[in-house]
A protein has these predicted regions:
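Residues forming the flavin
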Residues: 1-539
């Protein structure tokens, strides 16, 4: 059985003449009805009336099905209403051929409807992934929250304060992490890796490998006795190398789950932790655990990564001790950081002069040609934090353009100016080791029209956000990425939270730079989309 009825949309954006196309289709023996634009009230009324007055199998020829397919399907009731995209057709011949091809396809007779799985996989336990998981679970949907790190929380858990309100980051994030862990419909799978994704929307099979912690999570109480006796000291990745830690440790004080982990590559097998643990939680024979999950939808909240500052060698990162990244600065001023919040250089010296350099990697055709969005306001926030710790510190921000476009961001910028933060337009050419100061920044003031050398104790590089490019193992090809490596969407305006794979959704910075509030919004947005998806049967 094939279709022979066409509902032709008189969309003003079509590149072909609708009446001419209707005439050609009529001459081909088809029943054609031209409707006002179907995305208008008049067009919707016309479509409803047409389907009621002339029942049967219709085909809609309009703009892209990605934009309005769901709307057309709802109006079709029980029937199957395919949509042919005419926006891509430049000539009458091509438009006619596309419609005739679609009309020639067989119509499935009485397709079996299978209820989709009412479970969802969320990949990434940052604030966006946690928000999506909580919204889904609160709607009665089972969630598997997979996080590659030892704790959920993501980058936000490493920050001291958030902008523009300067709230304590972990103070507002911590309760959300605890809520996610305690929710009866959320299963945390931390220190885990997705090893396979197969299937389709409503019916995905996902393989997950849980790496061994060498600690029994059901017995560990997070007391830290094991770390106290461990003799192996290694750099702390959580503190970005600014502090050391033990081979066995809890990743940070507010970690969820609050469980110790042994990194076997550093372990010398002294078994002192085994003796020190009063709860018999140490299990040196742990093996990886394999899980198979059946889910109806997948949320990718895998985040982004900071630009590698070593590429900008003129700034001396990794060579000059006083040159830090903006995330390292956050750890330096954080009360739970390597100095317990004491504002000092990595060498332990007081900070009297501080400078921020913007757009490190961003807005540079050699590296990241786009604006990373968050960096200007983050640097202003960090300048205010420096003044909170040391009111007499001299703070300078070297900028390309100040872009504070979020709610309350411009007000924070004005507060920083009033507090004495100096803004110099122009990105420095290089950073040198100084004779009378740790560092000297060589710059050109584009507004003042002069060159200068600024002695500072610390220079903070505001890094752009780059795509992580971590590929997930989709059996039939994963979501398409854009030119910069971020996940793309079928439509950047109408379907910005969806990937190019049906049933796979995007939250947070995996699809482009975002700040925390935007990331939280995307988490809630994908949850709403999935709740609607899992209501419907799937063929």
């Amino acid at each position: 059985m094939t279709r022979s009825q066409v509902l032709l949309c008189a969309c003003p954006d079509l590149k072909v003449e609708v009446q001419d196309l209707a005439q050609r289709l009529t001459q081909a023996g088809l029943k054609v009805r031209v409707s006002p634009p179907l995305c208008t009230p008049a067009g919707l009324q016309e479509q409803r009336a047409r389907l009621q007055a002339e029942p049967g199998e219709w085909l809609v020829a309009a703009c892209g099905p990605a934009q309005h397919h769901g709307l057309f399907q709802r109006l079709a009731g029980e029937g199957i209403l395919p949509v042919v995209n005419l926006l891509e057709e430049d000539h009458l011949e091509g438009a006619e051929a596309a419609i005739l091809t679609a009309l020639g396809e067989e119509i499935p007779v009485a397709p079996g409807e299978v209820l989709p799985h009412r479970e969802v996989l969320v990949v990434g336990g940052g604030v966006g992934g946690c928000q999506a998981a909580l919204d889904l679970a609160n709607a009665g949907i089972k969630v598997y929250l997979v996080e590659s790190s030892l704790s959920i929380g993501g980058t936000m858990a490493q920050l001291d304060k958030t902008f523009p309100t300067l709230d304590c980051s972990i103070c507002i994030l911590g309760p959300k992490l605890v809520e996610a862990a305690a929710h009866p419909l959320i299963e945390l799978l931390t220190y885990a890796e997705v090893t396979g994704i197969a299937g389709r929307a409503g019916h995905f099979s996902v393989d997950v490998t849980l790496k061994p912690r060498y600690v029994d999570m059901s017995k560990c109480v997070g007391c830290g006795n094991c770390a106290e006796v461990c003799p192996v000291i290694v750099p702390s990745r959580w503190n970005l190398g600014l502090k050391s830690r033990k081979c066995i440790r809890i990743i940070f004080a507010q970690a969820v789950p609050l469980v110790a982990t042994i990194e076997k590559e550093y372990c010398i097998d002294c078994q002192m932790c085994l003796t020190a643990c009063e709860h018999s939680a140490i299990d040196l024979n742990c093996q990886p655990e394999e899980r198979r999950l059946e889910v109806g939808a997948v949320v990718l909240a895998t985040g982004a990564k900071p630009f590698d500052p070593a590429i900008r060698s003129e700034y001396g990162y990794g060579r000059l001790p006083g040159v830090l990244t903006n995330l390292e600065f956050e750890r330096l001023v954080c009360a739970t950081g390597p100095t317990q919040g004491y504002f000092q250089t990595p060498a332990g010296q007081p900070v009297k002069r501080l400078a921020f350099i913007q757009c490190v990697g961003s807005r540079d055709q050699r590296f990241l040609p786009y604006c990373s969005g968050y960096c200007c306001t983050a640097a202003i926030k960090q300048a205010m934090l420096a003044l909170e710790h040391e009111p007499d510190v001299e703070v300078t921000i070297f900028f390309n353009d100040i872009r504070t476009s979020g709610k309350g961001f411009e007000e924070l910028y004005l507060r920083a100016q009033a507090a004495g933060v100096r803004f110099i337009k122009g990105l420095p050419g290089r950073i040198e080791a100084g004779e009378d100061s740790p560092l000297v920044i060589v710059y050109e003031d584009q507004r003042g029209g002069h060159r200068g050398r600024l002695p500072v104790d610390l220079a903070v590089l505001s890094l752009g956000l780059a795509a992580s490019r971590q590929e997930l193992p989709f059996a039939e090809g994963g979501p398409v990425r854009d030119d910069q490596g971020f996940y793309g969407s079928p439509h950047p305006v109408l379907q910005s939270l969806e990937s190019t794979v049906p049933g796979v959704f995007l939250a947070g910075t995996c699809q482009g730079p975002r700040d925390i509030s935007e990331t939280v919004c995307t988490g809630s947005g994908v949850a709403a989309r999935i709740i609607n998806l899992l209501k419907r049967p799937s063929a």
